[in-house]
Amino acid sequence: MSGSVYLRDERAHLISENECMTDKPFTRRLCSCCSYAAVRKRLPILNWLPQYSLQWLKLDLIAGLTVGLTVVPQALAYAEVAGLPVQYGLYSSFMGCFVYCVLGTSKDITLGPTAIMSLLCASYIDHDPVYAVLLTFLCGIIQCVTGILHLGFLLDFISFPVLKGFICAAAITIGFGQVKNILGIHNIPQQFVLQVYYTFLRIHETRVGDVTLGLICILILLCLKFMKGHMKSTEPNTSFLVKSCCTIIWFFATARNAVVVLSAAVVAFVFTDHNLDVFTLTGKTAKGLPPFRPPFFSEKTENETLSFKDITEDLGAGLAVIPLMGLLESISIAKAFGSENDYRIDTNQEILAIGLTNILGSFVSSYPVTGSFGRTAVNSQTGSCTPAGGLVTGSVVLLSLAYLMPLFYYIPKAALASVIICAVLPMFDYTIFKKLWKVKKMDLLPFLLTFIMCFWEIQYGIVAGVILSSFILLYRVSRPQIQTILKSNLKACE
């Protein structure tokens, strides 16, 4: 889908506004809001749907199916990071596909659970699905208000060094958090420092089967990723057999997460069928589609009933950090792929799309979602033409929920851990230290502060980084570089 579609719509919207300039102010505003161009601005599907072709349909089907095979195993794994039962990863993976198809302005981006959002959620929900779903609803409300009031500029307060510091710390935290599943060790604390301590303290409890399977899965995933990155495009005169082999290799490399998880599940089933307890399995999961219902605004526990006020107090800073980071992650990805593929996105419309996805997602037991860089890259590389590919991806997830949930019992936790570890490895940018040192040494301070403090508490790391970054900015603004030009020098120049 070319960027010209959006450019024509912007011109049409401006023309319709100019036609109303001769009317009264209220009539002018009403005319602007009710014009067809304004409706198309709020419903971007109307921009590309009239031009939809069979060629686009073919490419969107391929892209949607490929992303679907990627998101199912990732969703199961990310639910583990969020501290929720694995089915909640799938509950969070389909609503964004349908909502974004109607409201999104990027042809490439896919919404769903991500490693970073899962880690953020785990910091606030304490393994409680009720907290997770209510957090999703409140995040959606906050994001929609941000979009309606055009408050997207607030994202600029999180500077590049702060964002990079958080992402690098998150990559280490998420990756090390899965070491316990690779080793087959249980009941490890969630806090990072305690996690490191108790993992090494109880390393003697390592299960050989889990370690062996986990390392093999990691090796296969890395090899398949390497093969995909080094595949060359076939020449026109290449034989049919060679083209077929290249296509098969490309498919397996692209859907490597699904291939590895499925293969590991088959191996685990064989061992379990022979009464051999070799691997730590995912275990029983809820069957079928999630019920469509509003989130619970209170929760009954064994000792007390938690009110809406109690839950929001427990969520605390998460009500600010999670919606803000979700918007920042998604919009950064959308802008990057829009620039790469030569089209523009509407930032405020993107914010509304993400917000509405989270609001509606809370009605199907989703936890907060955002744009996924990995799946967006897959979507773009497989030739998606419109957001319609999301309909196929969402359908794949729904079919998995409807028919495959009993089979997820046999998925080893070590296999899911390997998927997560390989997904977060590229998130750690080891070159960022050198880049910041060369470009602007002072930016290393907020980067390092955010990076270090995020190992203690994520929200403290982000807030501390933003505050320090703001102080540095104010310091530079308050001390501008002024050059004094003497009058004698001016005469000499003349």
Predicted feature locations:
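Transmembrane helical cores of multi-pass ion-transport proteins
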Residues: 2-488
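Solvent-exposed, non-transmembrane loop/terminal regulatory segments of multi-pass membrane proteins
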Residues: 488-494
